[in-house]
Amino acid sequence: MDKAAKFESLYRQYYTPIYKFCFRFLNNREGAHDVSQETFIKFFERMNQQGNKIENNRAWLYKVAGNLCLNSLNKKTRHSEIENTIEIQSVENTNPENILIDNEKSKMVRNAIGQLKPKNRALILMYQDGLSYQEMAEATGIKQSSIGKTLWRAIDKISANIKL
């Protein structure tokens, strides 16, 4: 398979998960789109460099996307509210009161995740996306043996923030 076909295949496979990761990290559609595009531009450039083989494409993409999200957050002061784009996950749950409760719960969880340190936020989002501990370690630079403990601490902080 030539490089262009390989890139296209990986783009199709990973664009949506990377975009969703960036959106949840930044809470901004345009920013998520920009960071996702920049991630794949960097991936394409890396593919075309001589002797730069990427061992784990998925982990590499999440690492670059996470770093670009951090850079984006550092450039801007964030005082915007979370967009009201909550999907109703169950068609059966059409009771307006239940929908409102579900929306509030989702908002509280997103806000609690947003209050985490950026590396912990990235870990939680990667965990939600189903990355292995090894992939999370490669993407964040945290030792694989520390990923579980760091994740549980982040989950505890989320729980504590929700209970407040």
Where are these regions (language model features)?
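A short, charge-rich alpha-helical start-of-domain segment used by transcription regulators
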Residues: 1-20, 33
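Sigma70-family region 2
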Residues: 40-56, 75-76
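Helix-turn-helix DNA-binding module
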Residues: 114, 118-119, 129-147
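A short pre-motif secondary-structure segment
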Residues: 123-124
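DNA-recognition helix of helix-turn-helix
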Residues: 140-164
